[in-house]
C-alpha cells in the first residue's frame, strides 16, 4: 500500500501521524492504544522513526509492518545512513520489502555525537540523503524526504544550500517531503514559495507538534534546530500544571494549523509522541475529521 498524496476525503488536505518504536512492552501497549484511538478519525498515512542501532531498526520494521497488518493504514518506515555500510542499508531495505513495507522516508540522520557535531563517514557507507533516495528508488520504494523551513541544523542558515539539496533529492526520485516541526506559518509559506521559484513540484507536508511537555519541547527543538519564538516562551513562562500546558499547547497548534490550512497546504503531519489525546483533539477542532 503506497502513501496517498491526496486525502481519502476528496478535495481535503491529508492528515498523517508520526510514531517512534517503543522501547518496552508498556510503551508498545501505549502505541497500540493510541493507534486504536486514531483509527476512529482515519489518518491518511503514518510513519515510524528509526534509530541507528540494530535493535531500533528491527523494532521499526516490526512495528511498521504490524501497523499495516493490524490497521490497514498506509505506512512509511524511516531510513537513515548513520553508522551503516551500503550493504547494511540494502539489507534493511530488503527487510522492509519482506515485511510488506513499500514507503520510506530517506534521511541522512544526525551524527551519533549529536545533530550539530561533524559528520563522521562510515567506511563503505552512504553519506548523503540524496544517495539514499536513489538506492531506495532503485529497490522500488516510494520515497519521501525531510524539509527544514527554519533551516537544516548543519547548514548554518545557508538556505540556498538547503534548497539545492532538496531539489537534488527530488531529481533522484523523492515524491514528497515532510518538514521538521516549526511555529511560524509565514516561514513555511516563504520556504515553499522559494522552492517553487526554483522549479520544484514536491508536495511539502508541514510537521506540527502538539506541545504537552515544555522541557521535551526545548530538547527536541535544540536537536532539530528549530527556534522557539519569544511569544511561546512568554505563554509557558511560570506554567507548571501539565493540564494547563496541554491546553495551551493545543491552542497554539490549532492556531498554526488553521493558518496553514487557510494558506492551502497539501496536508498536516503530526508528531504524536505515541499519544492520541492532543493530536485527536486538534484534528477535530480544525475540521479535518
Language-model region placement:
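Conserved N-terminal beta1-alpha1 strand-loop-helix module at the mouth
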Residues: 1-48
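Active-site-adjacent beta->alpha loops and helix N-cap segments on the catalytic face
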Residues: 2-6, 26-28, 54-66, 85-91, ...
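Active-site pocket-lining/capping segments in soluble small-molecule metabolic enzymes
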Residues: 5, 123-148, 161, 197-250, ...
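Short, well-ordered coil/turn segments that N-cap beta-strands
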Residues: 10-14, 42-45, 71-75, 100-102, ...
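Active-site mouth loops of central-metabolism enzymes
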Residues: 14-32, 75-87, 144-161, 237-251
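Conserved, mostly hydrophobic/aromatic
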Residues: 18, 46, 96, 169, ...
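Active-site beta-loop-alpha junctions enriched in small/polar residues
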Residues: 19-22, 49-53, 78-84, 107-110, ...
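Active-site glycine-rich loop that binds ribose-phosphate moieties when present
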Residues: 128, 157-174
